[in-house]
Amino acid sequence: MKRFAMSLAALLLVPVLSNQADAAPKTRYDATTQTCRVLSDGPLEWESRPWGQGGKLFKEVCKSCHTRNNDKGAPFLWVESKNPDAWNRVFATRYPKCAKNGSWNGMTQEQLLVLNDYLYRFAANSQDPNDSC
């Protein structure tokens, strides 16, 4: 009887303990397209991670100039250089020199969105479950 009670208690605790809290942002409002992008499910869940298209674009495109001691005069950047709202502002207003001088022209609109998703998701102070659409 004691073994049965322990087994039953263990079975009841499994669902409770398996619900892990995830503080990463689940959605992102994009001002350029006026849409709410779901980052926690579907293809964007994968693409907005470091190994997805967003992370690869950051490493291949952005980090080709924005490295330490670069000869292009570009400031050093890493994912946590800005908070999520600041990264959204960068893509909505396109104020950096690299956006104005045509360096972004080699990327499609969808690639820019996925890059913004990645930077938003892993930005400084982005691990706040209340910071989303």
Language-model segments: which ranges?
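Sec/Tat signal peptide C-region and signal peptidase I cleavage site
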Residues: 17-23
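Positively charged n-region of N-terminal signal peptides that target proteins for export
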Residues: 1-4
